[in-house]
């Protein structure tokens, strides 16, 4: 109960500070360009061709055709799509933030249906329509994987000296919504190069409880298709990302990117998965309103 109370106090503190918008230095000043000017809202929409693979058994690739982005950076408060926070402290090269954001793992499980070829993501889910009728046997019961609210601290630093040009990001997050008692720690380094390019390397640690909630198989869920599975421990997943952004005018830019995530063995060993990694690709244009 004490840990749950601390988590909700953290969330309440963040929301309270967001509403108060206390005066101070600009929030999230170390964000990647193009950054929203202090006190301003920015809305952009990316249109193009892209996809993200689904690691679940029989999971269909997820199309990435429209990529909206809404951001706001105030004096201490910031909102960047699904991420909201309050800047607690900063100097010329470092920053500490209080952060709230949703989990993403549940997206793999949206509108699953069991067809003759196995499980697949219902393509109508991507288009925002109703669920298609299943064409095979009734799927084994899997509990609903909820979207979890994650909250915690973030540290950003622009490095100098031998590492000049590198940006470092660290996040420590706890589950706030009470679905599981998981924790996640994220590490990443990024660098701009060749004017329009940006490369990032990272690693995410997810605790045993976190992995078990999304990728474990409980006794009530076990079936001939999916044996019971509980991870023995947490694990580190590795990530690499390359992005391209070339402005053509104040309102238009070309954007592309590719990303690869290699799951930890604790995730990859789940009987729900048939792939131990996921990758995504996107190429298109972005319009800034």
Q: For each of these PLM feature ranges, what is it?
A:
Residues 1-39:
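Cleavable N-terminal export/targeting peptides
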Residues 47-49, 68-74, 85-88, 153-163, ...:
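Residues on the lipid-exposed face of transmembrane beta-strands in outer-membrane beta-barrel proteins
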Residues 37-45, 64-66, 75-77, 92-98, ...:
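Outer-envelope beta-barrel architecture signal
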Residues 31, 82-190, 195-205, 212-232:
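Outer-membrane pore/translocation modules
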Residues 244-289:
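Predominantly the C-terminal beta-signal and adjacent terminal strand-loop region
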Residues 227-239, 245:
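A conserved mid-domain beta-alpha-beta active-site/ligand-binding segment of alpha/beta enzyme cores
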Residues 52-66, 115-117, 140-143, 266-269:
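Surface-exposed strand-loop-strand hairpins of Gram-negative outer-membrane beta-barrel proteins
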Residues 23-78:
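Short glycine/proline- and aromatic-enriched beta-strand/turn motifs that initiate or cap beta-hairpins
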């Amino acid at each position: 109960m004490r840990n749950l109370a601390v988590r909700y106090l953290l969330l309440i503190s963040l929301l309270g500070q967001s509403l108060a918008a206390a005066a101070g230095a600009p929030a999230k000043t170390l964000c990647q360009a193009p950054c929203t000017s202090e006190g301003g809202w920015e809305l952009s929409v990316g249109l193009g061709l892209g996809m993200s693979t689904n690691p679940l058994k029989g999971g269909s690739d997820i199309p990435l055709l429209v990529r909206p982005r809404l951001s706001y950076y105030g004096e201490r408060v910031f909102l960047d799509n699904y991420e909201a926070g309050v800047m607690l402290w900063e100097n010329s090269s470092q920053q500490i933030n209080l952060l709230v954001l949703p989990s993403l793992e549940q997206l793999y499980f949206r509108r699953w249906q069991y067809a003759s070829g196995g499980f697949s993501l219902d393509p109508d889910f991507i288009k925002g329509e109703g669920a298609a009728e299943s064409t095979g046997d009734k799927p084994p019961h899997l509990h609903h994987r909820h979207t979890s609210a994650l909250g915690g601290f973030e540290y950003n630093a622009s490095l100098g000296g031998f590492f000049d040009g590198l940006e470092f990001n660290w996040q420590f997050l706890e589950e706030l919504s009470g679905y599981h008692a998981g924790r996640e720690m994220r590490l990443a380094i990024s660098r701009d190069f060749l004017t329009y390019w940006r490369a990032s390397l990272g690693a995410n640690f997810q605790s045993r409880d976190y992995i078990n909630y999304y990728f474990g198989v409980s006794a009530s869920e076990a079936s001939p298709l999916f044996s019971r599975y509980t991870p023995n421990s947490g694990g580190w997943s590795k990530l690499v990302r390359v992005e391209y952004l070339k402005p053509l005018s104040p309102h238009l830019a070309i954007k592309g990117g590719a990303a690869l995530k290699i799951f930890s063995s604790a995730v990859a060993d789940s009987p729900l998965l048939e792939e131990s990694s996921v990758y995504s690709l996107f190429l298109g244009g972005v319009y800034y309103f």
